[in-house]
Amino acid sequence: MHEMSLAMAAIDLAAEQATQRGFTKVTALWLEVGSFSCVDPDTIAFCFEAAAKGTAVEGAQLHFQHQAAEAWCYDCNKTVTLTERGQACPECGGYKLRVAQGDSLRITDIEVS
């Protein structure tokens, strides 16, 4: 369950950013979850709640923004949207693709008080 380590890293980063700016509480956190990130939002929400206990992030609302996967096709020189790994380019049918976005998990916004 790699979601626990991801949740803990998000908690640490959010708490650190809040403290550096003179705030004591994180009230909400927005996470962008790429469709190829292999992260289950329900699982990370569960882990987040458990790992946040006793921290400045405890009780913070967790919001998810989903990001589609996009790749650059070397055959047709276009950026295309993909729905699954190993998929051929929807424009030309080629398989020379490099994922450009949608394979990560990142914090996009932090609300503090």
Swiss-Prot record:
Keyword Lipid biosynthesis (UniProt): no
One Gene Ontology biological process: protein maturation
Keywords tagged on the record: Metal-binding, Nickel, Zinc
Chain sites annotated for binding Ni(2+): 2
Keyword Metal-binding: yes
Cleavable signal peptide: none
Residues holding Zn(2+): 73, 76, 89, 92
A molecular function GO annotation: nickel cation binding
Domain of life: Bacteria
Entry-linked Pfam families: HypA
PANTHER family on file: HYDROGENASE MATURATION FACTOR HYPA
Function comment: Involved in the maturation of [NiFe] hydrogenases. Required for nickel insertion into the metal center of the hydrogenase.
Similarity comment text for this entry: Belongs to the HypA/HybF family.
Protein name (record): Hydrogenase maturation factor HypA
